[in-house]
Amino acid sequence: MGSELETAMETLINVFHAHSGKEGDKYKLSKKELKELLQTELSGFLDAQKDVDAVDKVMKELDENGDGEVDFQEYVVLVAALTVACNNFFWENS
């Protein structure tokens, strides 16, 4: 069994690949796949967004190369940004 951090890294990888490749490239998330991932894995994040275009905005911000898909590196940027925001929130409110 690995450390907590190794387990967390494995989970990030597994979550990405559980949702990627259903439509085309197995190493990227389409907009539909990204929406499914967000709804399944980050439903609290989506629920907090009152914007019906939240997924479109997230996709636009993440898709750095403009190919209309989110690769693993772009996905990790989302996870890192949300982790920083959560860390800041919890430290400020503790």
Curated annotation (Swiss-Prot):
Protein name, per record: Protein S100-A1
GO cellular component, one term: extracellular region
Entry-linked CDD domains: S-100A1 (cd05025)
Assembly and binders: Dimer of either two alpha chains, or two beta chains, or one alpha and one beta chain. Also forms heterodimers with S100P. Interacts with AGER. Interacts with CAPZA1. Interacts with FKBP4. Interacts with RYR1 and RYR2. Interacts with CACYBP in a calcium-dependent manner. Interacts with PPP5C (via TPR repeats); the interaction is calcium-dependent and modulates PPP5C activity. Interacts with ATP2A2 and PLN in a Ca(2+)-dependent manner. Interacts with mitochondrial F1-ATPase subunits ATP5F1A and ATP5F1B; these interactions increase F1-ATPase activity.
Biological role stated in the UniProt entry: Small calcium binding protein that plays important roles in several biological processes such as Ca(2+) homeostasis, chondrocyte biology and cardiomyocyte regulation. In response to an increase in intracellular Ca(2+) levels, binds calcium which triggers conformational changes. These changes allow interactions with specific target proteins and modulate their activity.
Binding site for Ca(2+) 2: 63, 65, 67, 69, 74
GO process annotations (BP): intracellular signal transduction; negative regulation of transcription by RNA polymerase II; positive regulation of sprouting angiogenesis; regulation of heart contraction; substantia nigra development; vasodilation
Upper taxonomic lineage: Eukaryota, Metazoa, Chordata, Craniata, Vertebrata
Organism: Homo sapiens
PTM-bearing positions, type S-nitrosocysteine: 86
Pfam families (alphabetical): EF-hand_1, S_100
Keyword DNA damage assigned: no
Gene Ontology terms for molecular function: ATPase binding; calcium ion binding; calcium-dependent protein binding; identical protein binding; protein homodimerization activity; S100 protein binding
Main location: cytoplasm
Highest taxon, organism lineage: Eukaryota
SMART domains: EFh (SM00054), S_100 (SM01394)
